Amino acid sequence: MLNIMEVHETNQMIEQEKLDVRTITMGISLLDCASDDVDKTCDNIYRKITTYAKDLVSTGKAIERDYGIPIVNKRITVTPISLVGASSCKTSEDFVKIAHALDKAAKEVGVDLIGGYSALVSKSMTPAEELLIRSLPQALSETDIVCSSVNVGSTKTGIDMNAVELLGHIIKDVAERTADNDSYGCVKFVAFCNVPDDNPFMAGGFHGVTEGDAVINVGVSGPGVVSRALDAAKGKDFEFLCETIKRTAFKITRVGQLVAQEASRRLGIPFGIIDLSLAPTPAVGDSVGEVLEKIGLEQVGAPGTTAALAMLNDQVKKGGIMASSYVGGLSGAFIPVSEDKNMIDAASSDCLTIEKLEAMTCVCSVGLDMIAIPGDTSASTISGLIADEAAIGMVNQKTTAVRVIPVAGKGVGEMANFGGLMGYAPIMPVNQTSCEAFVTRGGRIPAPIHSFKN
């Protein structure tokens, strides 16, 4: 039974502590849109998206109005396009046509982003998958809200180093093509290991082939709420601290569950999952970094940061999992540098380095996320960063990812501005010692011994 204090507490979370639902994401299967003609495939895709998602934005706004819960983004994910376009796309330009169809359909229904211009190549690349990857510079520079991801490895299959090596060059090319906008195209691309099928967050979201025809997935956000709750834990022991985070995560997730079920009911589309992730914004008081500092660090990046993040991540999961009937996606704590005020400050003061961020990715939701690096960073160095993160994910049986932005024409100490939720970031130094002989060997890194479970 709810009591009036709990109602007041929820209102306070929304009004003062920046609690919001980060995204309602509709996943749509496009497998039935495939044909042997690329123009027909584009027409099928446009028609299906605009039919299924026509009421998504208006429904999100209605739920916002009825419940007083801010819903920041409405998004769409689709089946990986390398699968949908495999029969009809004979060139990279054919895949770019599909990217334009996605962009047009997403704008027509009014969503903020559409994800799924993706390829799953954890073991090897088909010709169609390689064509899609090679189309990324043109596709991401010519479209506005299309997001892309490539899964380069998994615990079961190992790491496809051919794809990893290729992506270093692709990311550099995307950066050059969008140089006039601080290489913004790279913001819309992420390389994964162990990618989930039901991620509502961008840029890594797509509608997995194991999913049904359509689904509603919701991502919540609440680092500001956790931060405020931790004011009461100052000077207390770890038991009290963990209990505080856990209880707060439960309340945050319960709001997401309500929104997800209501959106599912109103749209007539099944509810999929709640992603428990604490997703920061560049606004003051909405920072995962601030939470870590309230746990007891002088600044993010100090010794103890990885342990504090591990504890935070675990308690968020323990609290959130009780609040939702289905939990999925990435679910934990995000550490995107450009989207988190306290992490921006820590990176600017050199307290937070890429090497420390890599250590933090061993215990949190994702990986090296929204990190601006010098524009003259070599393709092989970027491939090396992707390989390192993929190895962490592969060996530890967790999702890891890399979203780095080699900002064309800028160097260490300068600032890159991506705008809106994507924020801004100082250009961080990268170890430039060459790994080219390693990443260009060709082939794949085998799966680890503990992957053999049968």
From Swiss-Prot:
Signal peptide bounds: none
Cross-referenced NCBIfam families: PRK05313.1 (NF003700)
Name recorded for this polypeptide: UPF0210 protein BL1209
Record organism: Bifidobacterium longum (strain NCC 2705)
Gene3D superfamilies to which the protein is assigned, alphabetical: 3.20.70.20
InterPro entries: UPF0210
Oligomeric and partner information: Homodimer.
SUPFAM superfamilies found in the cross-reference section: PFL-like glycyl radical enzymes (SSF51998)
Lineage: Bacteria, Bacillati, Actinomycetota, Actinomycetes, Bifidobacteriales
